[in-house]
């Protein structure tokens, strides 16, 4: 029980810390919501040790627009240091997006060393700095608490079992992408709501959807979200069309409502 409450407390601390980091940069609730014309603020979500001794540092972002999707190419205006390009997104969906990517650092990474993600758009520069502060250590139970998915310690993230590989297309041709995932059937549907889960969403089962992760602007995806309950493989199919040549990364996300797994597909458009 002591460990359980420690995890919950840590999750709350990480959540509050993220809010503190963002508070000076995101709109207050009293401000008028803006559909367009706003900037993006990166966010450090916390760090997690890996089985091989390395450490993953997780980042997300807050697109302050309610409707507008933004594109910021890799470079001085979308930069992670050290390294420059560490797998960060270039396409930004509206509002708060958590745990979007991680940066793996070696096991001897110093406590005072930082991973810094800088985003600049519309003349505004925002920065997220991640380092190994003990209070910012997270695990899957903390992630479930942050996403409102309860605290099922036995839950495991979905697993992709098949899907499209890298593709090449010539304009104006489209590409069709598929991804199939399966899950352990947790969290299970609740017949009687647990006291600690009151206010959280009901488990929705496994779903798979496609998003634009990287590439030039002008990508259109046909609807690609499928949900089919518990412990069944789910296949999502989407058709992507492009306006510009370039290298794109399209991401399939499998979620059980609490934990997620992603699969990236690179599409080269000529």
Which residues does each predicted region cover?
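Positively charged n-region of N-terminal signal peptides that target proteins for export
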Residues: 1-4
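Sec-dependent N-terminal signal peptides
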Residues: 6-13
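C-terminal segment of classical bacterial N-terminal signal peptides
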Residues: 14-23
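Cleaved targeting-peptide boundary
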Residues: 25-32
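Extracellular/lumenal mature domains of secreted and surface-exposed proteins
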Residues: 28, 37-44, 48-50, 61-63, ...
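Short, well-ordered beta-strand segments enriched in hydrophobic/aromatic residues
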Residues: 55-61
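Ligand-binding face of N-terminal immunoglobulin V-set domains in extracellular IgSF glycoproteins
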Residues: 98-104
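Ser/Thr/Pro-rich, low-complexity mucin-like regions
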Residues: 105-148
